[in-house]
Swiss-Prot record:
UniProtKB keywords: Disulfide bond, Protease inhibitor, Secreted, Serine protease inhibitor
Annotated protein name in UniProt: Factor Xa inhibitor BuXI
Function of the molecule: Inhibits bovine trypsin and chymotrypsin, and human plasmin, plasma kallikrein, factor XIIa and factor Xa.
Cross-referenced Gene3D superfamilies: 2.80.10.50
Site (Reactive bond for factor Xa): 64-65
InterPro entries in UniProt: Kunitz_inhibitor_STI-like_sf (IPR011065), Prot_inh_Kunz-lg (IPR002160)
Amino acid sequence: DIVLDTDGKPVNNGGQYYIIPAFRGNGGGLELTRVGRETCPHTVVQASSEISNGLPVMIAALPRTMFISTAWRVSIQFLKVPTCTPKPSYWHIPQDSDMEGSVEVRVDERFPLEFRIEKVSEDAYKLMHCPSSSDSCRDLGIAIDEENNRRLVVRDGKPLLVRFKEANQDSE
């Protein structure tokens, strides 16, 4: 299946999108924040404000096709990040995080294909983490940490349901 955005258009391979919740009522889009001892935002969280779209991401797959398919592993990277944040800001799940399975951004020269988008219903998708060493994928959901951040983490059976909103230059 081709992944569709909030306007019903195919999600472009290499396109820029906001990842927003499929259903209102629990926070906004996905963005970066500082947690714990981080001096610079590295950790992927859901915005606390429902009206926030979060930060735009680029979603890319290796097959040189125009659109993103649910069959492929993709890389996800934030595009507009603070100066101190490593670039390119690819999503990654480090082994040494303070919260197990927490999605963070790290510099990765390898173009990491660690994620998949799966259709859940007509207007909702879920993000999954697929470690490169394995064929199995696990749901990404929200866990609230001790600082009340809504962190994006591996949560089997409790996925965050999302949609993809095109990040137009004029809708900043």
